[in-house]
Regions:
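Short, solvent-exposed helix-loop connector elements
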Residues: 101-107
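Alpha-helix capping/termination and helix-coil
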Residues: 102, 124, 168-172
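Conserved interdomain hinge at the start of the Helicase C-terminal
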Residues: 113
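Short acidic/histidine-rich active-site segments
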Residues: 128-135
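Short secondary-structure junctions
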Residues: 172-182
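Carbohydrate-binding surface patches
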Residues: 181-210
Length: 210
């Protein structure tokens, strides 16, 4: 396939490059295939790419965070990825990106924003912070106009993010990852379990508790 050939060619001139792929929503794959066009699933792309964007499940993330779907709808799908992909799969974990709603706008309550941010770091994969997320920027910048970030214009949570990054580096991420949601309480429990280590995180995504 093209991407495998491309990777082998790049390896000759740029060894050990990290390949990040931006896959598409499941609905887009279905639409393309229904018209007779090729569209790669995440499973196919992982044969060439090291990390993939979380866009396969992004509509579910938007649904649960906007109150249109129960929490479990998204987290059950995330949990299934642990057995549908190779055990060493690496998903990009983010709450926002250049063409999506800002996390600070999506979660205006501080406790919710901090809980979702902590969960994002705990989940299996590589964390993406988008420009200004460190200071809780709510405005989504234009893709076509220059809009410098006012680094003094928001609440600085960079120390909190640094602490989460330190914790993430200590997690046994090579072990089995599981995640589940309690819809009634708005709580998500995530864990890494294996013969060598175990770690559990409990996240009050509804903004209740500490």
């Amino acid at each position: 396939a093209f991407w495998q050939e491309a990777r082998r060619a790049v390896e000759q001139v740029r060894p050990d490059a990290i390949w990040l792929g931006e896959s598409v929503h499941l609905a887009h794959i279905q639409a393309f295939r229904s018209m007779g066009f090729y569209a790669a699933s995440d499973t196919e792309l992982f044969t060439a790419f090291d990390i993939l964007y979380p866009y396969d499940l992004w509509p579910l993330y938007e649904g649960v965070t906007e109150g249109r779907l129960p929490l479990s709808r998204w987290f059950d799908a995330v949990d299934y990825q642990e057995v549908s992909f190779d055990s060493c799969y690496n998903k990009l974990r983010c709450l926002e990106n250049h063409d999506t709603r800002r996390a600070a706008d999506r979660f205006p309550e501080e406790k919710k924003l901090l809980a979702w941010t902590a969960l994002n770091y705990f989940m299996k994969g590589t964390v993406l912070l988008y420009a200004g997320e460190e200071i809780c920027v709510k405005h989504t910048p234009s893709l076509f106009e220059k809009e410098p970030i006012d680094w003094n214009g928001g609440r600085d949570i960079s120390a909190y993010l640094a602490k989460l990054a330190t914790i993430k580096k200590q997690l046994p991420t090579d072990e089995l990852f599981r995640i589940s949601a309690d819809d009634a309480q708005g709580i998500v429990t995530a864990s890494y379990t294996g013969p060598a280590a175990h770690a559990v995180g409990v996240f009050p995504l509804a903004g209740k508790g500490g």
